[in-house]
A protein has these predicted regions:
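Small/aliphatic-rich secondary-structure junction motif
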Residues: 2-50
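Gly/Ser-rich helix-loop-strand patches that form or flank binding pockets
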Residues: 100-157
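Short, solvent-exposed amphipathic alpha-helices that sit
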Residues: 22, 59-70, 94
Length: 157
Protein backbone atom coordinates (compact mmCIF):
# COMPACT_ATOMS: atom_id res chain seq x y z
CA UNK A 1 0.00 0.00 0.00
CA UNK A 2 1.29 3.43 -0.93
CA UNK A 3 1.08 5.76 2.06
CA UNK A 4 1.78 9.44 1.52
CA UNK A 5 4.16 10.87 4.09
CA UNK A 6 4.49 14.21 5.82
CA UNK A 7 8.04 15.38 6.55
CA UNK A 8 8.96 17.53 9.56
CA UNK A 9 12.46 18.84 10.20
CA UNK A 10 13.51 18.45 13.84
CA UNK A 11 15.57 21.43 14.95
CA UNK A 12 15.87 23.73 17.96
CA UNK A 13 13.19 26.26 16.99
CA UNK A 14 10.06 27.01 18.98
CA UNK A 15 8.00 26.43 15.83
CA UNK A 16 8.77 22.72 15.80
CA UNK A 17 5.93 21.86 18.18
CA UNK A 18 3.37 23.38 15.82
CA UNK A 19 4.78 21.55 12.78
CA UNK A 20 4.84 18.19 14.59
CA UNK A 21 1.31 18.61 15.92
CA UNK A 22 -0.13 19.50 12.51
CA UNK A 23 1.80 16.84 10.58
CA UNK A 24 1.04 14.07 13.08
CA UNK A 25 -2.66 14.97 13.08
CA UNK A 26 -2.78 15.15 9.25
CA UNK A 27 -0.96 11.82 8.95
CA UNK A 28 -3.49 10.26 11.31
CA UNK A 29 -6.49 11.80 9.53
CA UNK A 30 -5.31 10.74 6.07
CA UNK A 31 -3.86 7.37 7.10
CA UNK A 32 -0.51 8.66 5.94
CA UNK A 33 2.94 8.41 7.44
CA UNK A 34 5.13 10.85 9.30
CA UNK A 35 8.89 11.28 8.94
CA UNK A 36 10.98 13.24 11.43
CA UNK A 37 14.30 14.33 9.92
CA UNK A 38 17.26 15.80 11.77
CA UNK A 39 20.22 17.21 9.87
CA UNK A 40 23.55 17.46 11.65
CA UNK A 41 25.65 20.31 10.33
CA UNK A 42 29.30 20.16 11.36
CA UNK A 43 31.92 22.86 11.61
CA UNK A 44 35.19 22.15 9.82
CA UNK A 45 37.57 20.68 12.42
CA UNK A 46 39.61 18.37 10.21
CA UNK A 47 42.94 19.41 11.69
CA UNK A 48 41.75 17.94 15.01
CA UNK A 49 40.54 14.48 13.94
CA UNK A 50 40.02 13.11 17.46
CA UNK A 51 38.10 16.24 18.47
CA UNK A 52 36.05 16.00 15.29
CA UNK A 53 35.11 12.38 16.08
CA UNK A 54 33.93 13.35 19.56
CA UNK A 55 31.93 16.29 18.19
CA UNK A 56 30.26 14.00 15.63
CA UNK A 57 29.39 11.40 18.27
CA UNK A 58 27.93 14.02 20.61
CA UNK A 59 25.94 15.68 17.81
CA UNK A 60 24.53 12.34 16.68
CA UNK A 61 23.60 11.36 20.24
CA UNK A 62 21.84 14.71 20.72
CA UNK A 63 19.98 14.31 17.40
CA UNK A 64 18.87 10.79 18.36
CA UNK A 65 17.64 12.05 21.74
CA UNK A 66 15.63 14.89 20.18
CA UNK A 67 14.17 12.62 17.53
CA UNK A 68 13.09 10.11 20.17
CA UNK A 69 11.41 12.85 22.23
CA UNK A 70 9.54 14.24 19.22
CA UNK A 71 8.68 10.74 18.04
CA UNK A 72 6.93 10.09 21.36
CA UNK A 73 5.03 13.39 21.08
CA UNK A 74 3.95 12.54 17.52
CA UNK A 75 2.90 9.04 18.61
CA UNK A 76 0.73 10.51 21.37
CA UNK A 77 -1.01 12.69 18.78
CA UNK A 78 -1.41 10.21 15.93
CA UNK A 79 -1.17 6.75 17.48
CA UNK A 80 1.53 5.80 15.00
CA UNK A 81 5.29 5.69 15.33
CA UNK A 82 6.98 8.06 12.88
CA UNK A 83 10.05 7.18 10.87
CA UNK A 84 13.14 8.89 12.22
CA UNK A 85 16.02 9.85 9.95
CA UNK A 86 19.38 11.49 10.60
CA UNK A 87 21.42 13.06 7.81
CA UNK A 88 24.73 14.89 7.95
CA UNK A 89 25.63 17.91 5.84
CA UNK A 90 24.20 21.26 4.78
CA UNK A 91 20.63 21.46 6.09
CA UNK A 92 18.86 22.68 2.94
CA UNK A 93 20.77 20.28 0.67
CA UNK A 94 20.13 17.27 2.90
CA UNK A 95 16.41 18.06 3.15
CA UNK A 96 16.10 18.30 -0.63
CA UNK A 97 18.20 15.15 -1.12
CA UNK A 98 16.06 13.19 1.33
CA UNK A 99 12.82 14.32 -0.30
CA UNK A 100 14.22 13.16 -3.64
CA UNK A 101 15.20 9.79 -2.09
CA UNK A 102 11.83 9.00 -0.51
CA UNK A 103 9.20 9.29 -3.23
CA UNK A 104 6.37 8.73 -0.73
CA UNK A 105 6.96 12.11 0.91
CA UNK A 106 4.20 14.38 -0.35
CA UNK A 107 4.43 17.43 1.94
CA UNK A 108 7.13 19.27 3.85
CA UNK A 109 5.49 20.74 6.96
CA UNK A 110 7.02 23.86 8.50
CA UNK A 111 5.65 26.33 11.02
CA UNK A 112 6.17 30.07 11.05
CA UNK A 113 7.32 31.69 14.27
CA UNK A 114 4.40 34.09 14.52
CA UNK A 115 6.69 37.08 14.87
CA UNK A 116 8.11 39.43 12.23
CA UNK A 117 10.66 36.81 11.17
CA UNK A 118 8.99 33.59 9.96
CA UNK A 119 11.83 31.42 11.27
CA UNK A 120 14.98 29.99 9.71
CA UNK A 121 13.49 26.97 7.94
CA UNK A 122 10.53 28.89 6.53
CA UNK A 123 12.83 31.65 5.29
CA UNK A 124 15.14 29.12 3.68
CA UNK A 125 12.79 26.47 2.30
CA UNK A 126 9.63 28.45 1.58
CA UNK A 127 11.69 31.39 0.33
CA UNK A 128 15.21 31.07 -1.03
CA UNK A 129 15.18 27.34 -1.88
CA UNK A 130 11.47 26.85 -2.60
CA UNK A 131 12.02 26.39 -6.33
CA UNK A 132 14.31 23.43 -5.65
CA UNK A 133 11.72 21.46 -3.68
CA UNK A 134 9.88 18.75 -5.66
CA UNK A 135 6.90 18.77 -3.26
CA UNK A 136 4.63 21.42 -1.70
CA UNK A 137 5.69 23.14 1.49
CA UNK A 138 2.93 23.58 4.05
CA UNK A 139 3.60 26.53 6.37
CA UNK A 140 1.48 26.54 9.51
CA UNK A 141 0.90 30.06 10.86
CA UNK A 142 2.56 30.89 14.15
CA UNK A 143 0.43 31.86 17.09
CA UNK A 144 -2.29 29.25 16.57
CA UNK A 145 -3.65 27.47 19.60
CA UNK A 146 -3.44 23.70 19.87
CA UNK A 147 -7.18 23.49 19.18
CA UNK A 148 -6.83 25.66 16.05
CA UNK A 149 -4.01 23.44 14.77
CA UNK A 150 -6.11 20.31 15.32
CA UNK A 151 -9.07 21.95 13.55
CA UNK A 152 -6.89 23.00 10.62
CA UNK A 153 -5.40 19.50 10.33
CA UNK A 154 -8.87 17.94 10.41
CA UNK A 155 -10.42 20.31 7.85
CA UNK A 156 -7.80 19.72 5.19
CA UNK A 157 -9.20 16.28 4.31
Amino acid sequence: MHRSKFLVIVDDTDELKTAVQFAAQRASNTKGGLVLLSVIEYADTQQWKSVEDIIHQEARAEAEKKLQEWSEIAFNISGQTPEIVIKEGVVSEEIINYINEDKKIRFLVLAASGEDNPGPLVSLLAGQRSGKLPIPTVVIPGGLTSEEIDDLASRAQ
